[in-house]
Amino acid sequence: YWSDRITAAGMIGIVTSTTGPVVAPHGGYRAVLGTNPLTIGAPSAGDHALTADLATSAGAFGKVLAARNAGESIPEGWAVGPDGEPTTDPATAIAGSLATFGGHKGSAIAVLVEVIAASLTDARYANDTVDIWSNPGSRMNTGHVVIAIDPASFIGAEQTATQVHRMQEAVRGSGAPGSVFAPGDPEFANATASAERVFLADTTCASLDALFDRLGLPRPVALDA
């Protein structure tokens, strides 16, 4: 959200955040790091912004929860169980820890993102946060750092946006047509397709129905696919 706001204003955005402890450093199995998402976005001339929005874990924690709710497995290499053994079972992964992406390099990035987002804001590191699900009303005290870089202070907004677009085209043209995507391409396509409707898994719909029933509210009406 904040990265999109920044790029819409013609600036380059860098956003980092911390979370609760769900990720183990490379070589470990105890969850002491957060998924520590990192977003970098840059406006592009005549195109959508070039934006990378990623968790520093091998897979986003939300995707692990979605796999559990759908009764599906997660990819190999995403997580280990409490015993440190690799697992593709999302429930075991939640009880254990997620892996960082990219081995020791991703692990280093995860640590540095946490240092930036927590240390500069006097927030807690993931391992020191309060579990708000077990302690409702408590403050988790995660940290967030939002940086906006104005290209006008460098080579100028127009020239920067043109350079960014050149990079997008170079990436897209590096393989067979339609087979290589620049950062942000899949998300832009998905946002366009979801502008009027959002597709939900049957298990998610069932959970929503149960919630609305419990609250005594009319169930949401599903649109035809």
What residue spans do the PLM features occupy?
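Long, hydrophobic, well-ordered secondary-structure blocks that form the structural core
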Residues: 1-25, 30-32
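Short beta-strand segments
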Residues: 14-17, 41-43, 52-55, 148, ...
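Glycine-rich phosphate/pyrophosphate-binding loops
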Residues: 11-22, 116-132
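Small-residue-enriched flexible segments
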Residues: 61-122, 139
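Short coil/turn connectors at secondary-structure junctions
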Residues: 8-12, 34-37, 45-49, 73-76, ...
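Catalytic-core signal marking the mid-to-C-terminal active-site face
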Residues: 120, 125-225
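Phosphate/diphosphate-binding glycine-rich loops and adjacent basic-rich segments that engage nucleotide
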Residues: 21-91
